[in-house]
């Protein structure tokens, strides 16, 4: 007692040394002292602590105790400072877990800061348990010695319980002090859970009234694990063989059963219980759980119940390719349409332009209806899948669906021939023989596409003399050599045409974008259909602008401005139509657009047009119509054999 009174009082380490050297029977004594802040510390006790710590650790580079001195322990802080005892426990734990690294920290003067950092890492209930487990693993790897006879190994839950009993639950300082007590007693550490822990944890997840896991609880547990198929009810269990992509387990005694056969079979909760012969009424007992756990692990490791990765379709384009090919197709459509406008600027080519328009009319009807029925309709209805597996292709309808749709188109063609032949063979009114289109009201594409060859010429300028222009029928006074003021309706007509054509081109761009978002083959078919009907549309609109009295340059400018809206529709469709479901809906809208344009716009223009050579016109209409259908039919039948 005289020695203790002679030395400077320090609270913790003296008691710690006494605990470590005298092997006190109650390890909670140090924790109690740490919590109350009582006790004294002297250099003799510190020296004993150093010897004990050095004896428990093992250093590969030599004796570990040479770097640690009493002055280093005293430098951690004074006993009356807040948190000093917790820092001292953390510093000792650092030395036990990494003696060589701690020696470097001591020489660099950062031992205290490292101890504070460890306390900060362990602060909090969610950080203390895993951090303590990792710390114990490092201490176990560095410490030496055997536990006392009859003493059980200490694990993190025990350290946390002892710290909680002392009235300091969740605080890292008392937990580390408890750890030092067991280190001083030579206790061993169990850093991993026991096998029973896993069973207890799983059974704690069930909230039933029985100690066993029911079928429903097992199914919910397997769903959380991401394994297991759909559990059938007793009423539909006998229909198991009719389920798509579903296989049931065969008995374990099945002859010639290969383990590879089961690697991709997804089992339900009822299947797993049946494999191990477990009763659904009894449920899964803790003993049975140990039996069926390998089945759950196999299901997880094999990925049998994981969603199958969607393999990219063979004809699927990347996002950059969609924008590139879509832009090129739209640009080509606009340029070809603009090139066709040159025919209208040439007075000598007016007759040729007329027959070119009529040929494209027939081709537009064939391409639009062919693309809508032969290509887009099976795709929207899921009857024509590309890039699927062989099993799916065997179950698909194949060419049979395409040929049935061809029969539908043949019905359309038969009635077209009937009406056209009746028109050609039956007597006509004298007015109809003049080669002028039938009566119509207002502006429409049909009106602009029915202009006679003599009307496909731009009007003469005033200095070129008077000549019947495109509005001669509606405004006879314009035949006068004196320029007259246009009516308000005639002045608004070019802008109405441009606005309507811009909206139409925007819809065409949406259709092209949705098609290229699906595949390049669908984009090719849709682009062909759009091109075939866009050329006569643009020619007709250009003729209608000339009909309204606009000069060629201004009419060409308005026509190009309306064509730019197709790019806006293309980019909107590519930016928004990213999902397979939205793609199907967009293509369904494109089907309606194509059928409306073909049957309500183009086909009436073909039926109502009048020409001095009706049989030549009839031949050109049939060539265009059958040619458009033939191209789309070949593309629909053999597109899977085409490689980009």
From Swiss-Prot:
Residues 345-355, 426-495, 551-555, 605-614 are cytoplasmic. Zn(2+) 1 binds at residues 504, 508, 533, 537. Pfam families: EF-hand_Zip, Zip, ZIP4_domain. A motif (Essential for SLC39A4 endocytosis) lies at residues 449-451. It is a multi-pass membrane protein. GO terms for molecular function: identical protein binding; metal ion binding; monoatomic cation:bicarbonate symporter activity; zinc ion sensor activity; zinc ion transmembrane transporter activity. Disulfide bonds join 59-64, 67-103, 153-188, 266-305. The record marks 508 as: Essential role in Zn(2+) sensing. It is found in: Cell membrane; Recycling endosome membrane; Apical cell membrane. InterPro entries: ZIP (IPR003689), ZIP4_12_EF-hand (IPR049406), ZIP4_N (IPR041137), ZIP_Transporter (IPR050799). Residues 1-27 form the signal peptide. The keyword Nucleotide-binding does not apply. Residues 28-323, 377-404, 516-523, 577-583, 636-644 are extracellular. Homodimer. Belongs to the ZIP transporter (TC 2.A.5) family. This is Zinc transporter ZIP4. It comes from Pteropus alecto. The gene is SLC39A4.
């Amino acid at each position: 007692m005289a020695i203790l009174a002679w030395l400077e009082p320090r609270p913790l380490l003296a008691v710690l040394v006494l605990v470590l050297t005298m092997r006190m029977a109650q390890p909670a004594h140090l924790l109690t002292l740490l919590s109350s802040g009582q006790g004294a510390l002297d250099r003799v006790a510190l020296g004993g602590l150093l010897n004990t710590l050095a004896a428990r650790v093992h250093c590969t580079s030599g004796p570990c105790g040479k770097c640690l001195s009493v002055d280093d322990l005293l430098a951690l802080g004074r006993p009356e400072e807040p948190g000093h005892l917790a820092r001292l426990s953390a510093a000792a734990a650092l030395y036990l877990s990494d003696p060589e690294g701690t020696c470097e920290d001591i020489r660099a003067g950062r031992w205290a800061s490292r101890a504070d950092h460890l306390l900060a890492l362990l602060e909090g209930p969610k950080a203390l348990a895993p951090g303590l487990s990792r710390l114990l693993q490092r201490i176990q790897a560095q410490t030496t010695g055997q536990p006392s006879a009859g003493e059980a190994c200490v694990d993190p839950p025990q350290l946390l319980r002892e710290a909680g009993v002392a009235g300091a639950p969740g605080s890292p300082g008392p937990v580390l002090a408890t750890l030092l007590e067991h280190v001083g007693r030579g206790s061993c550490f169990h850093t991993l859970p026991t096998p029973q822990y896993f069973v207890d944890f799983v059974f704690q997840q069930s909230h039933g009234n029985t100690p066993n896991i029911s079928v429903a609880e097992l199914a919910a547990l397997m769903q959380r694990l991401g394994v297991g198929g759909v559990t059938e009810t007793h009423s539909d269990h006998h229909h198991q063989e009719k389920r798509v992509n579903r296989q049931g387990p065969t008995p374990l005694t099945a002859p010639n059963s290969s383990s590879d056969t089961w690697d991709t079979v997804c089992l339900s909760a009822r299947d797993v219980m049946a494999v191990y012969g477990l009763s659904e009424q009894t449920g899964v007992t803790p003993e049975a759980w140990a039996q069926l756990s390998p089945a759950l692990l196999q299901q997880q490791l094999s990925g049998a119940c994981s969603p199958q990765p969607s393999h990219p379709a063979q004809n699927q384009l990347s996002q950059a390719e969609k924008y590139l090919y879509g832009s090129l197709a739209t640009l080509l459509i606009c340029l070809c349409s603009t090139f066709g406008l040159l025919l209208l600027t040439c007075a000598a080519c007016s007759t040729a332009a007329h027959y070119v328009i009529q040929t494209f009319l027939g081709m537009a009807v064939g391409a639009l209806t062919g693309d809508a029925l032969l290509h887009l309709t099976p795709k929207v209805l899921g009857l024509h899948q590309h890039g699927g597996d062989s099993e799916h292709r065997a179950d698909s309808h194949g060419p049979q669906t395409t040929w049935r749709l061809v029969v539908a188109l043949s019905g359309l063609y038969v009635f077209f021939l009937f009406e056209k032949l009746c028109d050609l063979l039956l007597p006509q009114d004298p007015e109809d023989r003049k080669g002028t289109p039938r009566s119509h009201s207002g502006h429409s594409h049909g009106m602009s596409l029915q202009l006679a060859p003599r009307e496909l010429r731009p009007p003469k300028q005033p200095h070129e003399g008077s000549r019947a222009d495109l509005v001669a029928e509606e405004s006879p006074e314009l035949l006068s050599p004196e320029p007259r003021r246009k009516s308000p309706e005639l002045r608004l007509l070019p802008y109405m045409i441009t606005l309507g054509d811009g909206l139409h081109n925007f819809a065409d761009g949406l259709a092209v974008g949705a098609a290229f978002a699906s595949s390049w083959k669908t984009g090719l078919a849709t682009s062909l259909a759009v091109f075939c009907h866009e050329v006569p549309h643009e020619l007709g609109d250009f003729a209608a602008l000339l009909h309204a009295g606009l000069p060629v340059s201004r009419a060409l400018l308005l026509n190009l401005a309306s064509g730019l809206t197709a790019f806006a529709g293309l980019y909107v469709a590519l930016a928004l139509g990213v999902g397979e479901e939205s793609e199907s809906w967009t293509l369904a809208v494109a089907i309606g657009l194509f059928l409306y344009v073909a049957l309500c716009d183009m086909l009436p223009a073909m039926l109502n047009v009048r020409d001095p050579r009706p049989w030549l016109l009839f031949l050109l209409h049939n060539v265009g119509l059958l040619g458009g259908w033939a191209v789309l039919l070949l593309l629909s039948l053999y597109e899977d054999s085409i490689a980009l």
